[in-house]
């Protein structure tokens, strides 16, 4: 019944936006495959966890997550909101620091997640997002967006247009 509902969203011209954790990526990919007529929006990268049983295992989590993202990108109906990595659940622990991170620190720590995802999906299927006010626990809004600009500087003007505007305008018809 869940898959029927997601397929119905596509028939009605709606998107299916979902946030979940990295260990749910395979099920999400299967859902996207079963509803190929629906634009499926992955929020927050399919959040790689860095707390609880995943604490201290960021490299191991990232290796599996990269494989999942690469496989998910084969589903042409999936687009990605790239952002939301500053949540405490991601394990960067900036919310525990006395001094918040700089935009350079954020860009450096998150760069591999962004570049891998944008490389797998292409800029036309990725859109920058903010996750405020949740990310405010870790950094200011201006620090976050300055970090995104630094990451985006590695892309052409046309690709930056897609990441900052074009993909979102296309997906949400605005």
State the predicted function of each range.
Residues 2-127, 138:
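Catalytic pocket-lining loop regions of alpha/beta-barrel enzymes
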Residues 112-116, 120-127, 135-174:
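Mid-to-C-terminal alpha-helical segments outside catalytic/metal-binding sites
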Residues 131:
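Active-site glycine-centered loops adjacent to acidic/histidine catalytic or metal-binding residues
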